[in-house]
Structure formats: C-alpha cells, structure tokens
Regions:
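Short, positively charged, Gly/Tyr-enriched micro-motifs
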Residues: 83, 87, 92-99, 103
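Short, contiguous, pocket-lining structural segments
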Residues: 46, 83-87, 118
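C-terminal catalytic subdomain
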Residues: 153-170
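Internal maturation/activation junctions in enzymes
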Residues: 49-75, 79, 98-155
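Short, well-ordered loop/turn elements at secondary-structure boundaries
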Residues: 22-23, 28, 90, 143-147, ...
Length: 170
C-alpha cells in the first residue's frame, strides 16, 4: 500500500526489501537449528526471544553505524525498516533423525507445524516490541516493529561461521 518497489541483486537472496538511492537494504539474520526442534518447540519464549535478539542487534548496528562514514544509506534503511530474518537450518537432518521420509505427508505436516510456529511467534514478538519500543516510521499504524521477521537461512556463510562443518547436509 506504500507503492515501494522490491528490487533484487545477486548479493542477498534470503529476503527482499525496498531500496532506493537514499536507502540501502540492510537486515539482520539468524537461524534456529531444527535438529533440536523437539527440545525447544514447546518453549513459548524461544522464537520470541530470538527475534528480540535480532532487533537488538539491528539497534546496535544503527547506533554504531551512525558514527561511521559511508553507512548513511544502510543506517537510514535499518532505522526505518528494522528488517530482521529468522530462518531455519537442518530440516532434512530433523527428518532423518525422526525417520520421516522427505516429501512424505508427514514431512509436509512437520514443515507446516514448524513454520506456523515461527510465523506466529515472530509476529507476536514484533507486535510486543512495537508496543514497548515503538513502530518505525514506515510501519506506523501496523502494530509491528520489523518489516520482515522471517527469512531463508543463509547456508554457505553459516557453514563458514560454523568452521566449515554443518549438522545439515546442505
């Protein structure tokens, strides 16, 4: 409803957001490991807190980036959108661990269960943060703090950070 065109590049495929000459897309991403899904799925604070963590990282980026020349467009975007993205890793490992065939009805049901939980808790945390800490200008009236809350998890960079190994097969 704001008539903002989404643009893409070969740099970021995890999520898409608006950008222009005054704003450079910037987001903060993390993943939850589905290998341990059964251990954290009933914790009502786990996903909620992960999104709060990501918003706090965006805030630190804004505060520190505001003092660095050359980051003006990215900081402006971060302030206005507070774009975060929580993704998942190791879905296929979870399926293997639980003897669920990939592509089976059971795997589709598990996929729906997982991502419904992520969406519900991510939206809930963004609404809570908007109420407690305020909505960014672009989201005034929506009751949300973050323009994006979920994202595809970056795999290659995560693997490098993990030291070149990964619980997931991808």
């Amino acid at each position: 409803d704001k008539k903002m065109e989404l643009k893409s590049s070969n740099i970021c495929i995890e999520t898409s957001e608006y950008s222009d000459y005054e704003k450079t897309f910037a987001c903060c991403l993390s993943s939850v490991n589905l290998y341990y899904f059964d251990e954290w799925k009933d914790d009502p604070d786990f996903i909620f807190d992960m999104n709060i963590l990501l918003d706090c990282v965006i805030e630190e980026y804004i505060q520190k980036g505001s003092k660095l020349p050359g980051l003006e467009c990215a900081v402006r975007f971060a302030k206005e959108h507070r774009s975060i993205g929580l993704g998942v890793t190791a879905f296929q490992t979870y399926l293997q661990k639980n003897n669920i065939a990939f592509g089976s009805i059971e795997s589709y049901q598990k996929n729906h269960e997982i991502f419904s939980l992520l969406k519900e808790q991510s939206d809930k945390s963004s609404r809570w943060m908007a109420e407690k800490w305020g909505e960014p200008e672009i989201l005034k009236g929506y009751g949300l703090r973050n323009t994006t809350r979920l994202a595809q998890a970056p795999k290659k960079s995560t693997t490098f950070i993990d030291g070149g190994t990964h619980l997931a097969l991808s």
